[in-house]
């Protein structure tokens, strides 16, 4: 479990440190976001049904990350956002494992996360910095569906 938490923290720290970049996602000079436009999604008014799973994830993450001899600063919401974005590109056993850790399938989690962020009024402030960074590699194939889902929800 500690190895899983370390992996999750690495993803989130990387997403946090690199998340302030531009909206241009490119590999080998090709803009992967060509043809990808954010579609407005419906905001779920009542998030309570799946809030138990999100809270459970948060508690499990904090329990696994806390040691009496250390001070830990951790945002379960940021971790969940980073994992949710990543899970949209996973499939098979990897996706199943990620959904098990997160407590919800990505098809449920995507609209929940979108709605959570959009529930705040204009005079309240909650900003998250999310980004997807890819290693430039000629063998890398980035599916348009992955980019579209993340553009729409995150």
Write out the residue ranges for each language-model feature.
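Extended, solvent-exposed regulatory segments
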Residues: 5-9, 16, 20-154
């Amino acid at each position: 479990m500690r190895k899983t938490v370390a992996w999750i923290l690495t993803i989130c720290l990387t997403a946090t440190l690199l998340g302030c970049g531009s909206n241009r996602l490119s590999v080998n000079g090709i803009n992967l976001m060509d043809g990808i436009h954010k579609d407005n999604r419906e905001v779920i008014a009542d998030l309570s049904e799946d809030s138990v799973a999100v809270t459970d994830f948060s508690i499990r993450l904090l329990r696994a990350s806390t040691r009496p001899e250390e001070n830990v600063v951790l945002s379960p919401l940021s971790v969940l956002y980073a994992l949710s974005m990543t899970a949209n590109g996973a499939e098979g056993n990897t996706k199943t494992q990620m959904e098990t850790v997160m407590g919800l399938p990505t098809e449920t989690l995507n609209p929940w996360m979108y709605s959570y962020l959009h529930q705040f009024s204009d005079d309240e402030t909650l900003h998250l910095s999310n980004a997807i960074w890819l290693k430039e590699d000629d063998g890398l194939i980035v599916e348009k569906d992955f980019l579209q889902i993340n553009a729409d929800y995150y």
